[in-house]
């Protein structure tokens, strides 16, 4: 109840499209599941993924491949948890973001460096004066909103390296 996230349990129904593609099944499993905790220190993560074939275009890797979905999921969970706890979502993010490196996630991903806390502070500073702009917009019949989200992007694909040595 103090806002410390201790676990994340995710069940995903993943659309693989109409046929098996090169890396289609790896997107909702390896590429998605490994980054589910985002840039938050969550010690326990459970991911259950069921892939289904549909009558849509086959899914394959292109720009991000599973990571945008994982980041969206954890950020929505943070927003919902903050609402249910009656806590400011930005405060909840700051409380749970990891700051020590290297950081090993519950799903086996090692993040070697980052400055997530600094990025949040920079975003808050960049939004200075937002309330005044919101009030001004409201007088003109326009609505403004402000949201924060963290995004973790890994620099490589699969979490392993392969080499073959021949003599």
Where are these regions (language model features)?
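Proline/glycine-anchored alpha-helix kink/cap motifs
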Residues: 1, 79-88, 123, 163-167
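Glycine-rich loop/linker segments at domain edges
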Residues: 1-77, 152-160
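Acidic/polar loop patches that form or flank catalytic/metal-binding clefts of enzymes
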Residues: 5-7, 89-93, 131-133
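Predominant activation on well-ordered alpha-helical scaffold segments within soluble catalytic domains
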Residues: 43, 71, 75-79, 90, ...
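Long hydrophobic segments that form regular secondary structure
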Residues: 61-102
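Helix-loop-helix junctions that connect adjacent transmembrane helices in secondary transporters/permeases
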Residues: 97-167
């Amino acid at each position: 109840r103090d806002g410390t996230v201790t676990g994340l349990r995710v069940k995903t129904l993943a659309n693989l499209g109409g046929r098996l593609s090169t890396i289609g099944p790896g997107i909702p499993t390896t590429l998605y599941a490994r980054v589910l905790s985002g840039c938050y220190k969550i010690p326990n993560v459970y991911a259950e993924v069921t892939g289904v074939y549909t009558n849509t275009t086959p899914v394959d890797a292109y720009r991000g491949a599973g990571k945008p979905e994982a980041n969206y999921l954890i950020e929505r969970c943070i927003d919902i948890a903050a609402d249910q706890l009656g806590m400011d979502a930005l405060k909840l993010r700051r409380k749970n973001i990891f700051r020590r490196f290297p950081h090993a996630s519950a799903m086996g991903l090692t993040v070697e460096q980052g400055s997530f806390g600094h990025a949040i502070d920079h975003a808050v500073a960049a939004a200075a004066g937002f309330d005044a702009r919101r009030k001004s917009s409201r007088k003109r019949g326009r609505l403004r909103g402000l949201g924060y989200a963290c995004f973790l992007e890994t620099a490589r694909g699969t979490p392993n390296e392969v080499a073959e040595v021949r003599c």
